[in-house]
Structure formats: C-alpha cells, structure tokens
Amino acid sequence: MKTRTLKVLKPTLALLLAASFSAGALAQEVTLRLVSAFPENGIYVQRLLPWIAKVNAEGKGVLQINFLGGPKAIPTFEAGNAVKTGVVDMAMNTGAFYTNVMPEADFLKLTQIPVAEQRKNGAFDAINKVWNEKGNTQYLARMVENQPFHIYTNKKIDKPDLSGQKIRISPVYRDFFQALNANVVTTPPGEVYTALERGVVDGYGWPIGGIFDLNWQEKTKFRVDPGFYDAEVSLTMNLPAYKKLTDAQRNYLQKQLLVLEAENTFWTRYGNVETARQETAGIQTIKFDAATSKAFREKAYEVGWAGAMKQSPEVAARFKTLFSK
C-alpha cells in the first residue's frame, strides 16, 4: 500500500515542483504600463515605438512594456501626476507638461549640454534627487535633445517684440513670451490647430520639428529665428515601481535606456529636414541681425533662470551650475 501511495505521489510532486519553478520564472518578468503625453501620430511616439518593440523582443522573461496610448489614455497635463500616483508605471513626457507635480520639471529646458554629459557631470543625479523627493518619480532617460524652440506667428515682426499678439504657450516659454510683450494663451497641443484657424491665437511656441505632425503648417506664416532653449522629452517612472524591479530587470532597463539616448543624434538631422520642409510649405523665416539675435537668445536664458530662481532658488542654483556650458 505504501509503495503504491509513493508511486502516485511521485508524479504529483514532480508536477507541483515544475509548476512552482514555472511560476518562479514568470514572476521574474514584469510588465510596465507606459503612456505618452504627446499624440500617437507625432514624431516622439513614432520614435518610441520601435524602442518599445526592441525592449519587448529582447526582454522576454525579464521586462516588457505595454504602451497604453497618448492623451486619449491619460490627458496631456495629467500624465505626470499619473506617474507620481502609480496610475501608470511610465510616461513619455516633457517637464513643461507636469509643472503641476513640481515646478522644477520645467527647468530641464535650460540644459545646454548633451544628456551624455549630464550623466557624467552629476546633473542626471541632481535631477533624480529632486524628482524622487518631490515627484515620487524616477527620471529615466532623455530621448529628445538638439531641438530648439521657435516662435511661430501669423503676424510679421521686425524686432523681438510680440506686442498685440496672442501666442499659445506652455510653461516652457510663458515668462519669455511675456517679457516680449505677448498676450499668452494656454492650450493643449491638440487644440492649437483650431485656435489658429479661429484666430483665438496668432501664433505659438514649438520646437523646430513636429508642426507637420499636427498640420500646423497649414495655419502658419512665419517662423522667428534664432531658436532658444532645448526641447526636452524624457521617460519617467513611478518611483515605487522602479524600486520594485529586481536587479536583473533594472539593469536590463538601464541598458535599453542608454541605447535610446545614443540615438539622439537623429534630432539634429531631423531639425535640418524640418527646416527645409517648412520653407517648402511656404513658412517664411524672420531673422534678426547678429547682435539682436545674440541678445534675443541671452534674454531667453536670463528670463528662464530668473523664473526658475523665483520658483525654487536652491534647485535652480544647483541646476544652473550643472546645466550650463
């Protein structure tokens, strides 16, 4: 009787052990939910999707990313808080869109050195100290750089003065455009086309690339040169979710994030292509003389850092040292 019982138990025990090992293996794979604060048809998402596919293809059994979508999944200005509270695990976002979480998020526009150097000189660690403490967020990687912002307008100007113009803004250039005497209007990117069409705004601020993704070229007459600041689009992650990752998962994610950042050379080429496309589309360039252009850029940074100092003096002082050339 004992012999028979053992014979029955042995296969059962083997099955239980196999199931246990299988469950253990599955437990080592984590799936992270990611949203984009930008529209899905835009260049930023289009650059992100192949990276997600690569992460998933190479990360089976370790880490997967589930892309939930753009603003239809989580509205643009709520994505930062969704990461902070853990509604989602990750977001592709820009600091200007989550100043409601912490004002320091907008300071990233003022970086004048590449992200690779930021990782070496302590800037990246300084960013994460603030993001961890104030945003319950881990700053993972910067995937867009070398994309200066520009003023786009339907009213021609011959000097850096936007008096009488209604300009769509985000926190990125609110202070600067107000210093140029603009009447500023805040609206999500998805509503700008209609605002231009109806004359609610005369122009807007945006990087050198991306206006074709939103069809804004159809309602835009002029671009003001030179550009200023540097468009920042980054991946962020809920801090508790980040800390929950195993060493293997965290190391794998970090490896893939560095691969993503290494592709940032794309943005300089893209900016050149977009400049040519704008000219072909009939957008005229407004240029100032050399002295005025230099003063224009200097004023942008002067105003930007002044605003940062008012909002968070200690952090701004630390960042200015690390972000400047």
Curated annotation (Swiss-Prot):
Q: What protein family does this chain belong to?
A: Belongs to the bacterial solute-binding protein 7 family.
Cellular localization per UniProt: Periplasm
Does this UniProt record's set of keywords contain Signal? yes
- Cystine bridges: none
Q: How does it assemble?
A: The complex is comprised of an extracytoplasmic solute-binding protein and a heteromeric permease formed by two transmembrane proteins.
Q: Which organism is it from?
A: Polaromonas sp. (strain JS666 / ATCC BAA-500)
Q: Which residues bind phenylglyoxylate?
A: R168, I169, S170, P171, V172, Y173
In Swiss-Prot or TrEMBL terms, this protein is called: Solute-binding protein Bpro_4736
Q: Cellular component terms, GO, for this chain's entry?
A: periplasmic space
Concerning InterPro entries, the annotation shows: DctP_fam, TRAP_DctP_sf
Sorted UniProt keywords: Periplasm, Signal, Transport
Under the heading Gene3D superfamilies, the entry gives: Bacterial extracellular solute-binding protein, family 7 (3.40.190.170)
Pfam families named among the record's database cross-references:
DctP (PF03480)
Q: Name one GO biological process term.
A: transmembrane transport
The signal peptide stretch is 1-27
Is ATP-binding tagged as a keyword? Answer: no
